[in-house]
Amino acid sequence: MVTIGVDEAGRGPLAGPVVAAAVVLCKPRPSGLDDSKKLSAARRAELEEKIKRRCRWAVGVVEPDEIDRLNIFGATMLAMTLAVGALCEQLAHDEDVGEVLVDGNLTPHGRRPEWCWPARPIVGGDALEPCISAASIIAKEHRDRLMREAALAHPHYGWERNAGYGTPEHLAALREHGPTPLHRRSFAPVAQLQLL
């Protein structure tokens, strides 16, 4: 039986996808795992490389139009489901999922029809469970990379620095240049601009 850790990145930004990662840790696991928000960018990048090289992992990405259609909670549950499903495709036929540990107080169980794994929510799990810590690192690094790439096509918003969050720089650019296709139209600061 394997244990899968799941976490997401990007619930709060005004732009870009929500990304979930699922990880089955290797033995021995990479040392220094912690909540991705507590790690420096350099340490996250180093751990991401170790996790990707030695452990099994997958990501699920839900784009802004789907976030607007489902709402951010539904999109997060979908991203988690996609990540775990993709990871399960990598498991050997004789490996069963014992449990999916999900950061937070809710899981996709009963919320997504495709979810078929035993799941346990753990509040603060990204700092408590190493497999969730690993997932938080993979999710954050993957999403940050997507936003840096998006910044090349949309340079006014500072996404390479703010990852799509509603910083003063991003809000000022949004007022001046308007929303892009990567903006979440259902999020208040973007929706309010559309009413003007």
Swiss-Prot record:
- EC annotation? 3.1.26.4
Comment on bound cofactor: Manganese or magnesium. Binds 1 divalent metal ion per monomer in the absence of substrate. May bind a second metal ion after substrate binding.
Under Gene3D superfamilies, the record lists: Ribonuclease H-like superfamily/Ribonuclease H
PROSITE patterns the UniProt entry points to: RNASE_H_2 (PS51975)
Which residues hold a divalent metal cation?
A: D7, E8, D103
Q: Where in the cell is it found?
A: Cytoplasm
Could you confirm whether the keyword Repressor appears in this record?
A: no
Give residue ranges for domain RNase H type-2.
Answer: 1-196
A single Gene Ontology CC term: ribonuclease H2 complex
Give the protein name, as stated in the record.
Ribonuclease HII
GO BP, one example? Answer: mismatch repair
Cofactor(s) required for function per UniProt = Mn(2+); Mg(2+)
The UniProt similarity line reads:
Belongs to the RNase HII family.
| Main function | Endonuclease that specifically degrades the RNA of RNA-DNA hybrids.
Which reactions is this enzyme annotated as catalysing? Answer: Endonucleolytic cleavage to 5'-phosphomonoester
Which UniProt keyword terms apply here?
Answer: Cytoplasm, Endonuclease, Hydrolase, Manganese, Metal-binding, Nuclease
This protein's species is: Novosphingobium aromaticivorans (strain ATCC 700278 / DSM 12444 / CCUG 56034 / CIP 105152 / NBRC 16084 / F199)
Molecular function GO labels: manganese ion binding; RNA binding; RNA-DNA hybrid ribonuclease activity
- What domain of life is recorded for the organism? Bacteria
Tell me the enzyme class. hydrolase
Q: Which InterPro entries does the UniProt entry name for this protein?
A: RNase_HII, RNase_HII/HIII, RNase_HII/HIII_dom, RNaseH-like_sf, RNaseH_sf
What taxonomic classification does the UniProt entry list for its organism? Bacteria, Pseudomonadati, Pseudomonadota, Alphaproteobacteria, Sphingomonadales
